[in-house]
Amino acid sequence: VTILLRALGYSGKQAGAVWPQGYLDLAGSIGLTGGLESLRAGAAINRAQAAQLFVNALKCKTADGKVYYETLGSDIKKKTIVLAVGVTTDDGSTSGAIRTTSNKNAEAYLPAHGDGNPVALQGRRGDLVLDNNGEIITFVPDDSTATTITLSGDAQAAYVKGNGGQQYTISSDALVYIGSEGEGKSWLDAYASLTAGTQITMYSERGKITAVYSTTSTTT
């Protein structure tokens, strides 16, 4: 915790003279220990907890008042959905390449350092941070509400129904993204391709569905 606070630019001036409790209190106040309420001074942490700390750190504000992940790159793609991972790039490489809703003409981004194949991020929405070369530095999932369902019948012009019988209203200006395609389409242009048995993920903001993601537009 202390090391991450230092990386964020904090020092004993902000944490106070009492160590380690002062640092733990500071970490809690900026959200660094969010989701880790059981964390105590001197307690061991496991890998999952350590990973959570690093994810939290990306979203924390630095001592200068800036969101940390926004200081890491030169270009930030907001509210980006990861459409596909391991895709083929122009040079034939597939190592860690991902396609997102921020890409134009189905271009694929590569990681700035090392290889990666973040399958768990497919279908997630968040902010994509790029360097000067347009390569990925990090992806920070956002806190948008996401609901995944399997369609019980073909999608309709104004709504969809899940296997559990629940119905969801979708506005005509919602964007639909298919994992195998590069660019989004309006709901009215895309809903007819979402047939019974298709799994979709719907993203909501303030109670309104604003985007829909599907790995495929046909029943598998």
Residue spans of the language-model regions?
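Serine/threonine-rich low-complexity intrinsically disordered regions
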Residues: 62, 215-220
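A cross-kingdom feature marking solvent-exposed beta-strand/loop segments within repeated
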Residues: 113, 173-187
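Active-site-adjacent structural elements in enzyme catalytic domains
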Residues: 132-134, 142-144, 192-217
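Acidic Ser/Thr/Pro-rich low-complexity disordered segments
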Residues: 159, 172-175, 219
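Generic structural signal for alpha-helix starts
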Residues: 34, 93, 170-172, 210-212
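N-terminal propeptides
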Residues: 1-164, 186-189
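A short macromolecule-binding patch
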Residues: 107-109, 166-175
